[in-house]
Amino acid sequence: MNPSTAQARVVVDELVRGGVRDVVLCPGSRNAPLAFALQAADAAGRLRLHMRIDERTAGFLAIGLAISAGAPVPVVMTSGTAVANLGPAVLEANYARVPLIVLSANRPYEMLGTGANQTVEQLGLFGSQVRATISLGLAEADGAGAGSYDQQNSVWRSAVCRVLAAARGTRSGNAGPVHFDIPLREPLVPDLAEGEAEPAGRAGGAPWTATQYATLDVPLEIDLTPDTVVVSGHGAGLRPELAHLPTVAEPTAPMHGPALHPLALPLLTPRQAIITGRPTLHRQVSRLLADPAVTVYALTTGPRWPDVSGNVVGTGTRAVTSGGPRPEWLAHCRELDEKARQVVRAELAGHPKPTGLHVAAVVMDALREGDQLLLGASNPVRDAALVATPRPGVRVLSNRGVAGIDGTVSTAVGAALAHPGRTIALIGDLTFLHDAAGLLIGRGEPRPADLTIVVANDDGGGIFELLEQGDPQYAGVFERVFGTPHGMDLAALCAAYRIPHRQVDPAELAAELAGDAHGLRVLEVITERSSLRELHATVRAKIAP
C-alpha cells in the first residue's frame, strides 16, 4: 500500500470512529487518496458522501448538515484556490460556532515557492478564524509489509482526534471550524493489486483518543425585582430559571418566558436586561442594551459574550435568581405584546399588495410540530420575527454567525438532508440567486426528501428600503446601487437545474404548504418592496400609545 493511500484510509477510518457520518467531497487530483478512501467508506455504509463541484457551496452544504445534525462535518478538497473558496463558510462557522472541518489536500511542503502548479501557502490560510490549524507530515513507509506504517498510524489517528475535539469544542466549550491540511505525495491512487489492510485502530471501533466534554459552570446572581426583560439571541440555550420573564426572542433562539414583540420594546422602560446567546437582529434591542440606565447581564455557554455597547456588568453560564418581577410589569409587557402582534397582522390584512412580511406570515402559520425552518439572513429572518413566534416543536435555523446571504440554498439543502421531517426555507430573491449553484445536485447523490424553498421575489434588495439608504431623499440613486433589480426568470433557472418550480400568490402558498414537498421544490411569490418603508412606519405608529 503506497503511503498516501495508507494515510488517507487511516484518516477516514478515524473520522468515522470519531462520530463523523456525513462528508462533503469536491473533485480534484491532489485529494484523490482521500476521495478513494471516502468512496470506499460510503460504499460500506460507514458514512454518507456528498459530491459537489463548487467548493463554496460545498462549505455551506457542510454547515447545513452540521447545524441540523449537531455533529462535525468535513468538507474535502484539493489544493490551491479550492481551499480559499471555503473562506465564507469558515467565517460563518467561526462566529456561529459550527463544527466545520476543512480537510484540504496539499502539495508536499518542499514544493512551496518553487513555482509548482496549483501550489500555494494554504497552511494557516484561515488565520484566527479557525479553532485550530493541524497538519500531518508526509506519509513515508517505515518498511515493507503490513506493519510498514505502524509508527505513523498512532500520529495520524491522534491528529484526527485533535481535529474533532477542536471542532466540537470538547475542551474549550467553543465549537467551530478547524483547518486540517494534509500534504500528499504521488502516487495519489491505490495500487490495483493491493490487498493489504490499512493500519488498525483501537479495538471495537473506538476512537484512538477519547475526549470528554468539559463543563463550564459559572453561576451569576441576578435580582429579578427590578423590571426585567430577556433578550434571547442566536445560539442561546433554554434557561428554565428565566421562564417567567418577558422575552424578546429571535426566531432561531428559545423563548424562555412570555413572548415580547420587538416592536413593543421601545414603549417599555425596563431597569435591567438579561442577554442569552448573541442578539443579531433588532435595532430596538441594540438601543436597549446601549442605554446606560439599564443594567445588562449576559449568559452564554462559551468563552465569548456579546457586549457591543460595553454596558454588560456581569457574565455567567446560568443565573441564580432572587426576587421576582412585579405582576404589574408582567401585565404591561403582555398587553403591549398582544397589541403589537394585532397591529402587524391588521396592517398586513389591509395592505393592497403582498410583501415579504405577507410571505413570512404564511410560512410561519403553516409550520407544524416536527418541521425545520431555515430563514434567509436578510429580510426573511426579520420578517419572521415580526409576524409570529415559531410553534413548539419547530426547529429554526439561520446563518447568523456573520449574517451573510452566502450559501443559503446550500445550507438549506444540507439541513434538509440531516433532518428526518419536513424542511421549509424562506429566502429572498437575491439570496436565492447568490447561491443558485446550491441547486446543482449530481445524479445519484443524496437528495432532500422534503425541502420546500420559498422565495419572496421583490426583484432586488428589499432590506435596503428599510435602512438609511432607503430614505426618499436618496431615491435618485437608490434603485441601481441598492435596489439592484435583476429581472431574472426563476422558473427558467430552476428548470436548468431540473428543480420543480411554481409561482404562487400568498393564498396558493398556504395551500401548497399544507402538504409535503416529496423532494426538493421551489415556490416563488412575487412581492413588492416600494411600500415597505411606509408599511413598517405605519405599524410602529399604531403600536405607539
From Swiss-Prot:
Its top-level enzyme class, in one word, is transferase
User: Which cofactors, by name?
Assistant: Mg(2+); Mn(2+); thiamine diphosphate
**Assigned keywords, A-Z:** Magnesium, Manganese, Menaquinone biosynthesis, Metal-binding, Thiamine pyrophosphate, Transferase
UniProt xrefs under Pfam families? TPP_enzyme_C (PF02775), TPP_enzyme_N (PF02776)
Instruction: State its Enzyme Commission number(s).
Output: 2.2.1.9
Q: How is the cofactor bound?
A: Binds 1 thiamine pyrophosphate per subunit.
The reactions it catalyses are:
isochorismate + 2-oxoglutarate + H(+) = 5-enolpyruvoyl-6-hydroxy-2-succinyl-cyclohex-3-ene-1-carboxylate + CO2
Q: Does the keyword Magnesium apply?
A: yes
Tell me where on the tree of life, at the top rank, the source sits: Bacteria
| GO biological process annotation, one example | menaquinone biosynthetic process
Q: What's an example of a GO molecular-function annotation for this chain?
A: thiamine pyrophosphate binding
- Pathway membership: Quinol/quinone metabolism; 1,4-dihydroxy-2-naphthoate biosynthesis; 1,4-dihydroxy-2-naphthoate from chorismate: step 2/7; Quinol/quinone metabolism; menaquinone biosynthesis
Q: Which HAMAP family match?
A: MenD
According to its UniProt entry, the function of this protein is described as: Catalyzes the thiamine diphosphate-dependent decarboxylation of 2-oxoglutarate and the subsequent addition of the resulting succinic semialdehyde-thiamine pyrophosphate anion to isochorismate to yield 2-succinyl-5-enolpyruvyl-6-hydroxy-3-cyclohexene-1-carboxylate (SEPHCHC).
* Family according to the record: Belongs to the TPP enzyme family. MenD subfamily.
State whether it acts alone or in a complex, and with which partners, per the record.
Answer: Homodimer.
Q: What is this protein called?
A: 2-succinyl-5-enolpyruvyl-6-hydroxy-3-cyclohexene-1-carboxylate synthase
- UniProt lists the gene as menD
